[in-house]
Swiss-Prot record:
Organism field: Sus scrofa (Pig)
Name of the gene this protein is made from: SH2D1A
Region Interaction with FYN SH3 domain: start-end pairs: 67-92
Ranges annotated as biased composition (Basic and acidic residues): 116-128
Name this protein carries in UniProt: SH2 domain-containing protein 1A
Stretches for region Disordered: 103-128
A matching Pfam family: SH2
Function noted in UniProt: Cytoplasmic adapter regulating receptors of the signaling lymphocytic activation molecule (SLAM) family such as SLAMF1, CD244, LY9, CD84, SLAMF6 and SLAMF7. In SLAM signaling seems to cooperate with SH2D1B/EAT-2. Initially it has been proposed that association with SLAMF1 prevents SLAMF1 binding to inhibitory effectors including INPP5D/SHIP1 and PTPN11/SHP-2. However, by simultaneous interactions, recruits FYN which subsequently phosphorylates and activates SLAMF1. Positively regulates CD244/2B4- and CD84-mediated natural killer (NK) cell functions.
InterPro entries, A to Z: SH2, SH2_dom_sf, SH2_prot_1A, SH2D1A_SH2
Positions bearing N6-acetyllysine: K89
Keywords assigned: Acetylation, Adaptive immunity, Cytoplasm, Immunity, Innate immunity, SH2 domain
Gene Ontology cellular-component terms listed: cytoplasm
Amino acid sequence: MDAVTVYHGKISRETGEKLLLATGLDGSYLLRDSESVPGVYCLCVLYQGYIYTYRVSHTETGSWIADTAPGVHKRFFRKIKNLISAFQKPDQGIVIPLQYPVEKKSSARSTQGATGRREDPDVFLKTP
């Protein structure tokens, strides 16, 4: 999971929401560990000022699955990256297609902006 750039690990729901709201872009998304269910992940998506959270889990057979809107056919994916790619398309049972990945930067990287101030080394938004 660490190879997935939108995976932020064990961050709180509040921290994830702040990261998404800071983008201001509907369709911004990230993955984090679930706080309430061990071994489960949360796919968090910004839409119209609200954060929508979908549980993502790794099945016993090694597939990945996401809990989506009721009535939507459950799909299984071999890799988490395939799940993310599928949800970048419309009508997949989530509120809006995944559009703007909020990626976690390596903590070893630190940048200075044009103003000379240190920018946040932990997160950046990747636009298509």
